[in-house]
């Protein structure tokens, strides 16, 4: 979905009111600080919108810095590809203009400093979004060398960018065989990275916690049950996924619980 017919070259972000999707707040070239939590809270952000042309509700707040009317409200901050199509978006709350300066990028543009709340924009996700924008998620395994936090950020982008990247691609029909490579599964998040790519290809999403994995097995997320999952290097993965997880009145190792969830939804898990 294109954010606006007025998108220009280099504009990577678009703001739209949460209360009225016809209230478009404008484009920006950069949103520095969006992925950097402030010390006083995981979701608190101070964001520098560089090269911004504010409109609508945001424009109304620009002239009231320092007063209550500087708070524009809640919005959706979309991330745009090179053609101005929305790749994904974050809900941002209590968007407040705290500074306005002329922009060096172009006459008529301003640089806005905003305070807002956004706990879904995880640190490190900006790097993954740039890979999506540049079309660099064209082979599997790009997540292998990411830190634990980086893998979590990877999964978040895989989820938020799913609709854009799949482009209404239908689920694989029932009876398919998928192969998950267990060599790089060292913790729970790396399992989700691996199975996401096994089902949906490079940068694919197929859950990022146990409940989400179970939801994805209900169809609509890339694969139709029943299907077969060949789990390569499963012995190595089992040795890593040893965390004890509550399961009913008892608890189970994470590896065993994952297999149980898969099999309960009709997946034939072949451990190799």
Task: Show where each model-derived region lies.
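Helix-rich interaction surfaces within compact, conserved domain-sized segments
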Residues: 239-272
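Extended, compositionally biased accessory segments flanking or bridging domains
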Residues: 2-25, 138-197
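Phosphate/adenylate-binding glycine loop and adjacent helical scaffold
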Residues: 1-4, 17-146
């Amino acid at each position: 979905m294109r954010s606006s017919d007025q998108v220009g070259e280099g504009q990577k972000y678009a703001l739209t009111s949460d209360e009225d999707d016809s209230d478009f707040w404008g484009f920006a070239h950069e949103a520095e600080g969006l992925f950097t939590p402030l010390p006083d809270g995981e979701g608190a952000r101070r964001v520098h919108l560089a090269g911004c042309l504010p409109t609508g509700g945001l424009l109304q707040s620009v002239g009231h810095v320092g007063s209550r009317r500087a708070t524009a409200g809640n919005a959706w901050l979309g991330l745009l590809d090179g053609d101005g199509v929305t790749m994904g978006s974050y809900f941002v709350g209590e968007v407040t203009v705290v500074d306005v300066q002329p922009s060096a990028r172009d006459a008529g543009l301003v640089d806005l400093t905003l305070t807002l709340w956004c706990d879904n924009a995880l640190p490190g996700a900006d790097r993954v979004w740039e890979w999506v924008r540049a079309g660099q998620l064209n082979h599997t395994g790009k997540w292998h060398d990411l830190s634990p936090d980086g893998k979590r950020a990877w999964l978040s982008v895989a989820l938020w960018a799913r609709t854009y990247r799949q482009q209404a691609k239908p689920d694989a029909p029932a009876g398919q065989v998928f192969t998950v490579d267990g060599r790089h599964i060292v913790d729970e998040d790396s399992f989700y990275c691996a199975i996401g790519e096994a089902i949906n290809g490079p940068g694919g999403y197929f859950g990022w916690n146990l409940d989400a994995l179970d939801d994805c097995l209900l169809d609509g997320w890339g694969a139709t049950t029943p299907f077969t999952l060949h789990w390569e290097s499963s012995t190595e993965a089992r040795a890593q996924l040893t965390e004890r997880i509550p399961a009913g009145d008892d608890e189970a190792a994470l590896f065993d619980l994952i297999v149980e969830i898969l099999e309960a939804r009709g997946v034939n898990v072949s451990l190799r």
